[in-house]
Amino acid sequence: GYESMNVSKDMAYKYRARYYYTNRSNNQTYYGRWSNYRYFAMPSISGKTTNKKKGIKVVLKKGTGIKQYTVSVSKNSKSGFKKVKTVKVSKKKSYSFQITKNGKKKFKKGTYYVQVTPKVKFGNKTYSSDVSTVASAYVYK
């Protein structure tokens, strides 16, 4: 069996899972072992279309329980991301900045993908999120 949870953007979550099975003949439920805790957050992100001299404008919303964001860029939506910036969270409600290079290379005309991976804090420890959010932006001449 399974149960799902409602997830809100810009919120950090800590979860664990276990399998359970209910025998219909005797109505008895059997439970498996709990997994280790996992951590994730789904940040709100937008990548704005811009020209290649200005780069890509990225806007992030501050999330509850999120301590920093790692920002990466790629020409491919699924792989090849290169880290370009780390954003530490403060008291601001949102963060806006320009990315002018893809790693060490300047942007060329085309579609780029911006990936944001949050780091979440629970107790005294900080964990990298299991989930990243990706937004696309088109760079023109």
Q: What would you call each of these model-derived segments?
A:
Residues R24-P43, G123-K141:
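Extracellular fibronectin type III
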Residues G47-K52:
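Short, solvent-exposed loop/linker segments at the N-terminal edge
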Residues M5-N26, N102-T126:
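Beta-strand-rich modules
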Residues G1-K9, T70-F107:
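Recognizes extended acidic, P/S/T-rich segments that occur
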Residues R24-Y31, S72-K88, K121-S128:
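Acidic Ser/Thr/Pro-rich low-complexity disordered segments
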Residues Y2, A12, Y37, G55-K57, ...:
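Intrinsic-disorder/low-complexity, polar/charged segments enriched in Ser/Thr/Lys/Arg/Asp/Glu/Gln
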Residues E3, A17-Y19, S35, L60, ...:
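Gram-positive cell-envelope targeting signals
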Residues K54-G65:
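Conserved aromatic anchor
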